[in-house]
């Protein structure tokens, strides 16, 4: 399947960042060569509904931002951890449609940043080749 690019998502914890780094490195391998459009930090901070201007970095601060800078890719968004996301999901409503909440605004920011990243990618790189799966030795499920 030809891919325009990959968006790597992580949480701020070091163990999650290590996995995100492996993901970026995988996409950048010559045999895969899928452009990385950027990184998203999920559960970046906690914001209580009654104090929307307060940010509590319960899982650490700036982890994905630092990794993105280290790897030379863009940080596309820092998605906060808020109770209303779970409540909206339970009710079948997308979090992005919650009005001017911190999470809805950041999800809209993410969408805009992904569009910008795709536009930049399409100007600077040729179309991506299809990524094919193989049955190489060691990869078999038998």
Indicate residue ranges for each PLM-predicted region.
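Conserved catalytic-core segment of NTP-binding enzymes
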Residues: 1-87
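C-terminal boundary of histidine-terminating zinc-finger modules
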Residues: 89-104
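Acyltransferase
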Residues: 102-118
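A short, charged, Gly/Pro-tolerant segment at domain boundaries
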Residues: 109, 113, 123-142
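Residue-level signal for alpha-helical context at structural boundaries
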Residues: 24, 103, 125-128
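A generic alpha-helix propensity feature with a strong bias for hydrophobic helices
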Residues: 83, 97, 129-130
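Charged, solvent-exposed alpha-helical segments that act as regulatory interaction surfaces
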Residues: 33, 116-124
């Amino acid at each position: 399947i030809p891919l325009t690019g990959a968006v790597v998502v992580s949480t701020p914890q070091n163990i999650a960042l290590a996995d995100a780094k492996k993901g970026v490195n995988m996409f950048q391998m010559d045999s895969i060569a899928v452009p990385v459009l950027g990184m998203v930090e999920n559960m970046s901070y906690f914001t209580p509904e009654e104090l929307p201007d307060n940010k509590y970095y319960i899982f650490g601060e700036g982890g994905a931002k630092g990794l993105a800078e280290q790897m030379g890719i863009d940080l596309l968004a820092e998605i906060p951890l808020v109770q209303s996301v779970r409540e909206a999901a339970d009710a079948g409503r997308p979090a992005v449609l919650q009005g001017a909440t911190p999470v809805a605004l950041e999800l809209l920011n993410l969408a805009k940043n992904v569009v910008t990243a795709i536009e930049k990618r399409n100007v600077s790189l040729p179309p991506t080749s299809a990524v094919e799966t193989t049955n190489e030795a060691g990869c078999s499920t038998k």
